[in-house]
Amino acid sequence: MSIYLDNQAAKPVDVRVMAEMTLYFNEKFANPASLHCDGDIATDILEKSREQVANFINAPNSSDILFTSGATESNNLGVIGAARRLKKKGNHIIISEIEHISILNIGKYLEREGFRVSRVGVDRFGKIRLDKLERLITDETILISISTASNEVGTLQPTAEISKIAQEKGVLFHTDAVASESVIPIDVQEVPIDLITLSSNDIYGPRGVGALYLKKGVRVNPIIIGGGQERGMRSGSENVPGIVGFAKAAEITKKEMPQESEKLKILRDKLIKNVLDTIPKSHLNGHQEDRLPHNAHFRFDYIEGESLILTLKEHNIAAATGSACSSKTLEPSHTLIAMGLLHEEAHGSLLVSLGRTTRETDIDRLLEVLPDQVKRLRKLSPLTPSDLLKKYEEVK
């Protein structure tokens, strides 16, 4: 049986979520837009689900939640929709250099529409430089979009401070919270944020469902035109079974997050300590303390991350080198390059992301396999220095 340690890319659907969804596939399957009794039932469950997702982030009004097909659509609707709506006010948008690929490509798309997009830098741990962010804001700035945490190296961003800066400057603030939503609480009444991207699968719900939170008074131009569902901002018949699953996943995650996050942090810390202690020339990417409790992102000198993933695959261990959404390219991680790493350093990375089903025995097995596989690849690498090879020979 394989050991799954790629939870940042995809998570299994919780069995309790699947059980909740079943009824809405073949019994209560009507369209919420229909006027008959079955349509009323679908509308009721849709609005109940909206309330549950709103409660997940402590949103005061369930109408603040728009359902979408997932995080990429929510990012598009939030950033493109807000930018187009505010174009008469200004044409300047700020994102970070280490955003998810969907936000980076949205930035390029908006530049082709005539918007000016600035990309704020990060420090060597992947944390936003707040001083640089403030200096980038002008009278033309209408939107800041910065993720709550890096989906790759796991560094938590100073969301509260960014929110304060945005409020003081009268600029909308959008955050993609997908990387953190399963392990870090979101409270929009404690930290005011204008737009938030959420994903169902990242809290162990079904894929193909997401949401965009819009603070009261904030509106976006629709990017999908049709029947005017979701307050006229996101057309298309709602995916009721998926939304029911999303809502159940939100309910479970909110309740179990404190204990689950602590469990994951203990496993993560055990993994990090043992890897850094037992494998020479190994490094932790991202911030040591301000990081996601389920994220461990390493780099190993003198080897390729892709080769390491393939050797772990031989031992039925699933891990990654970085973001799944850009893993098919052989280019070095844009996040690691932005953090100041050289191309050859960025290529030697391994992302281990833990989840609800991760057990301590999974970590033990990885720690049993990983040192030998790193050693094996280094012996084959022309980059490995002779003194390290000699040490490996001495401990045979």
Please report, for each region that a protein language model flagged, where it lies by residue:
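Pyridoxal 5′-phosphate
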Residues: 1-396
